[in-house]
Amino acid sequence: MEEYHRHCDEVGFNADEAHNIVKECIDGVLGGEDYNQNNINQWTASIVEQSLTHLVKLGKAYKYIVTCAVVQRSAYGFHTASSCFWDTTSDGTCTVRWENRTMNCIVNVFAIAIVL
């Protein structure tokens, strides 16, 4: 793994930065694809691994949890929820919703500050 330096003087999770990173990862994996059940495991694994790699490369003092769900688009919709008990001044979350004509994707990033 590449070396990086942590920026410990920064306070607070930058959800916009995380959103942009995750969106690029989703676009790179799912962009131009149609829903195919046989590819879901590979797609979701690629999205979470790439997102996590790029988040860690930021060098910030966080532990990250990244989840991804991809479902076939239907008239019934798709709903998710999450809840966290943490320090809202330093920890944070980001949810990215992505869709095309055949599928929906939801990625959640949970960032927990490492306090030394």
From Swiss-Prot:
It comes from Canis lupus familiaris (Dog). Acts as one of several non-catalytic accessory components of the cytoplasmic dynein 1 complex that are thought to be involved in linking dynein to cargos and to adapter proteins that regulate dynein function. Cytoplasmic dynein 1 acts as a motor for the intracellular retrograde motility of vesicles and organelles along microtubules. Probably binds BUB3 as part of transport cargo. Required for the efficient progression through mitosis. One of its GO terms (cellular component) is microtubule. GO terms for molecular function: dynein intermediate chain binding. Keywords: Cell cycle, Cell division, Centromere, Chromosome, Cytoplasm, Cytoskeleton, Dynein, Kinetochore, Microtubule, Mitosis, Motor protein, Nitration, Nucleus, Transport. It is found in: Nucleus; Cytoplasm, Cytoskeleton; Chromosome, Centromere, Kinetochore. Its main location: nucleus. One of its GO terms (biological process) is regulation of mitotic cell cycle. Belongs to the dynein light chain Tctex-type family. The modification 3'-nitrotyrosine is found at residue 4. Homodimer. The cytoplasmic dynein 1 complex consists of two catalytic heavy chains (HCs) and a number of non-catalytic subunits presented by intermediate chains (ICs), light intermediate chains (LICs) and light chains (LCs); the composition seems to vary in respect to the IC, LIC and LC composition. The heavy chain homodimer serves as a scaffold for the probable homodimeric assembly of the respective non-catalytic subunits. The ICs and LICs bind directly to the HC dimer and the LCs assemble on the IC dimer. DYNLT1 and DYNLT3 compete for association with dynein IC (DYNC1I1 or DYNC1I2). Transmembrane segments: none annotated. This is Dynein light chain Tctex-type 3. CDD domains: DLC-like_DYNLT3.
